[in-house]
Swiss-Prot record:
GO CC annotation, single: nucleus
Positions of post-translational Phosphoserine modification: 239
Family: Belongs to the AP-2 family.
Region feature H-S-H (helix-span-helix), dimerization, mapped onto this chain: 280-410
Name this polypeptide is given: Transcription factor AP-2-delta
Tissue-specific expression: Highly expressed in brain, placenta, skeletal muscle, thymus, small intestine, and prostate, and expressed at lower levels in leukocyte, spleen, testis, ovary and colon. Barely detectable in heart, kidney, liver, lung or pancreas.
Keywords recorded for this protein, A-Z: Activator, DNA-binding, Nucleus, Phosphoprotein, Transcription, Transcription regulation
Highest taxon listed in the record's lineage: Eukaryota
Location of region: Disordered: 416-452
PANTHER family assigned to the protein according to its UniProt record, in alphabetical order: TRANSCRIPTION FACTOR AP-2, TRANSCRIPTION FACTOR AP-2-DELTA
GO terms classed as biological process: inferior colliculus development; negative regulation of neuron apoptotic process; positive regulation of transcription by RNA polymerase II; regulation of cell population proliferation; transcription by RNA polymerase II
Gene Ontology molecular function terms on file: DNA-binding transcription activator activity, RNA polymerase II-specific; DNA-binding transcription factor activity, RNA polymerase II-specific; RNA polymerase II transcription regulatory region sequence-specific DNA binding
Function text: Sequence-specific DNA-binding protein that interacts with inducible viral and cellular enhancer elements to regulate transcription of selected genes. AP-2 factors bind to the consensus sequence 5'-GCCNNNGGC-3' and activate genes involved in a large spectrum of important biological functions including proper eye, face, body wall, limb and neural tube development. They also suppress a number of genes including MCAM/MUC18, C/EBP alpha and MYC.
Length: 452
């Protein structure tokens, strides 16, 4: 009997409230009933053990229905022929009510089960469709599986397992309540910038929210600065082209190595809707820029541009290159080549200045065509935002060198023309001087003749 009604015997033996004799008398009646129905003891609904293949998965199609008819028919006939088995006859405590309701859910009426299962399957299909459109189906399927592993069996949400059932005189949880609970746990909405945000209950996760603060790798001890890492930046590190694993991501975020460090990081990312599977392999080659967060990479690019502008010897380099070709025949051709190079360099700079790759917490609207913008975005993601500003700084320095070359050539040409004009003028003055001397001598000779 203890194997057939474990919950009832345990409850009758441990309760000492003055009514043990009455309950034991009822249990005696139940024992006779159990002996007469020993053929059904192996399949009794109170001792039925579920297997992993007999409950409805939320990823089955909506037309898949599960109805354990042999258990339902026996449970229905047994309760109606023996009313002492009903929960009201024993007035069991709340824990026993929850156990009986769980058994009623397992062997309930087919219509309630089908409605709950259809609602769950319909909601799952809708969520899968949204996730495919957003490109993040894998990131959220782990969360759905975790819901199933924590008791969301038979199409039921875990929060609804211990709710009172229809046999206790209360309304059962409907499909609307089930859908609302699923939406509260793993709903997807879009923010104003078009990013994916995860809604869990009343908490809304925005891609621009702060994930953590990371100390800089390149700063000295006297000027250590921290850089903010947003959820969107972490998502970019987990997405192509890098697809970093837990070890590399933990190194970027400066997390100390621990026994459960990777698992804790994956759980935190999973709560935010980001998928980081265990044993993942990186997709891109690791460089020194891989270890930098985007804030520090931008800081490095700004310092590089400032150093190029203030410390690079652009004038000395430009004059040195211009002196290599100072022949009169080459000067005109060199000027034309320098002007053409400056024009091409300016066009390149204008193109890079229109790059709208996502960086930090910003996701600007693209200006360029998507065919060229996706390549610039790939380069920006690989360099963590350092590449494009660094190239712009180098191009600006190159423009300064070309300008110095052009100024030196123009100055040298003007100096030569001025020297030639001065030499011609001096030669004319030297020819006029002897004529003036001869005329003065002739005048003096005429004066002497007159005196004579």
């Amino acid at each position: 009997m203890s194997t057939t009604f474990p919950g009832l015997v345990h409850d009758a033996e441990i309760r000492h409230d003055g009514s043990n004799s009455y309950r034991l008398m009822q249990l005696g009646c139940l024992e006779s009933v159990a002996n007469s129905t020993v053929a059904y003891s192996s399949s009794s609904p109170l001792t039925y053990s579920t297997t992993g293949t007999e409950f409805a998965s939320p990823y089955f199609s909506t037309n898949h229905q599960y109805t354990p008819l042999h258990h339902q028919s026996f449970h229905y006939e047994f309760q109606h022929s023996h009313p002492a088995v009903t929960p009201d006859a024993y007035s069991l405590n709340s824990l026993h009510h929850s156990q009986q309701y769980y058994q009623q859910i397992h062997h309930g009426e087919p219509t309630d089960f089908i409605n709950l299962h259809n609602a769950r399957a319909l909601k799952s299909s809708c969520l899968d469709e949204q996730r495919r459109e957003l490109g993040c189906l894998d990131a959220y399927r782990r969360h759905d599986l975790s819901l199933m592993s924590h008791g969301s069996q038979y199409g039921m949400h875990p929060d609804q397992r211990l709710l009172p059932g229809p046999s206790l005189g209360l309304a059962a949880a409907g499909a609307d309540d089930l859908q609302g609970s699923v939406e509260a746990q793993c709903g997807l909405v879009l923010n104003g910038q078009g990013g994916v945000i995860r809604r869990g209950g009343t908490c809304v996760v925005n891609p621009t929210d702060l994930f953590c603060s990371v100390p800089g790798r390149l700063s000295l001890l006297s000027s250590t600065s921290k850089y903010k890492v947003t959820i969107a930046e972490v998502k970019r590190r987990l997405s192509p082209p890098e697809c970093l694993n837990a070890s590399l991501l933990g190194g970027i975020l400066r997390r100390a190595k621990s026994k459960n460090g990777g698992r804790c990081l994956r759980e935190k990312l999973d709560r935010l809707g980001l998928n980081l599977p265990a044993g993942r392999r990186k997709a891109a080659n690791v460089t020194l820029l891989t270890s930098l967060v985007e804030g520090e990479a931008l800081h490095l690019a700004r310092d590089f541009g400032y150093t190029c502008e203030t410390e690079f010897p652009a004038k000395a380099v430009g004059e040195h290159l211009a002196r290599q070709h100072m022949e009169q025949k080459e000067q005109t051709a060199r000027k034309k080549m320098i002007l053409a190079t400056k024009q091409i360099c300016k066009e390149f700079q204008d193109l890079l200045s229109q790059d709208r790759s996502p960086l930090g917490s910003s996701r600007p609207t693209p200006i360029l065509d998507l065919d060229i913008q996706r390549h610039l975005t790939h380069f920006s993601l690989i360099t963590h935002g350092f590449g494009t500003p660094a190239i712009c700084a180098a191009l600006s320095t190159f423009q300064t060198v070309l300008s110095e070359m052009l100024n030196y050539l123009e100055k040298h040409t003007t100096h030569k023309n001025g020297g030639a004009a001065d030499s011609g003028q001096g030669h004319a003055n030297s020819e006029k001087a002897p004529l003036r001397k001869t005329s003065e001598a002739a005048v003096k000779e005429g004066k002497t003749e007159k005196t004579d």
